[in-house]
Amino acid sequence: MVTLNIYSIIKMKRFPKRNYLRKTKVSFFNRSQRHFSQHLNIDIIGPLFKITRKDEKHYNFQYNDGLNILDTPFNNDDDHCTPGKLYFSDSKNICKYLGFGDNLRKISLPIDNPDFKMTKCLYGEKYGANMLIFGEKFDLDKVETYQKMILMDIDIRAGNDNAMIIAAQKGNLEIVKFLVESGANVKSQDNCAVRLASEFGHLDVVEYLYKSGANVKADGNYAITWACKNGHLPVIEFLTSVGADIKAAQNLPIKMAAIGGHLNVIKYLVDRGANISTDNDYVFNIACRNGHTDLAEYAVSLGADIFSDGCYGIDHAIRYNHYKIVDKFIGT
């Protein structure tokens, strides 16, 4: 069986030389019964790719090298991310989907197979087929993959620098540096890269992005707020040193730290002026709700009024069976 990818078809048809990152309309014609049962007129941009997870499964379908044939009826509608299709995208758009997996697979289509079916999804620049041929596999956690992407005419800035943002979220500094040096904007999507790097505790990435021009106070001091929620004290210390506001949004960082139960972060913020009694002793209330006895004790030591009208901490402790806290503050 002859199998070709779309990029090869374009070159074989001896079309005028062009930039293959530009949109090229490729038509499939039903010239005989051994080709297609219908005419497909779908816009394809360059070579084709798919993102897969480590186990290379999706909707319980196991992908393998070579030909993959859908084992359920083909879903011929234009919905996306629904069962009944094997999904893929093109070189202009594949980087929009990097967050959905761990591998980049180069694919081709068995266009000479009379049973081959394909549709374009209504939302998102991707396609669905009942057959795909898996070629090379590239690890999305290796910088070499992104270097090869450029050689394969993949738009590494697709989705408003989605590749850089995903790398920042994962803490892959080498990839972040490569993408920035290749033209990615560290401020894309309201400084999303530094916000996510902070949220997930990747100090080296946060420092690099800040030095490269990212705004650590973007989106209402999102970076320090979510670093507090997840207890990333080294990131919090750095963000504070470069101007992040620990009192942002009515002391939201200390409230988020309380939700996460991070006493060390709470103490750090209090030492720098955060108000532990904010919002009717929210810190004490949420500590009781989540069973964080040490945090509840610390809040009381700094003046939390456990019997005030707006303080529901003890009620929460009783409701959620945190009897150690109940015994601590009101006895048996």
UniProtKB/Swiss-Prot annotation:
This is Putative ankyrin repeat protein R896. SMART domains: ANK (SM00248). It comes from Acanthamoeba polyphaga mimivirus (APMV). It holds the Pfam family Ank_2. ANK repeats lie at residues 159-188, 190-218, 219-248, 249-278, 280-308. Gene3D superfamilies: Ankyrin repeat-containing domain. Keywords: ANK repeat, Repeat. The keyword Repeat applies.
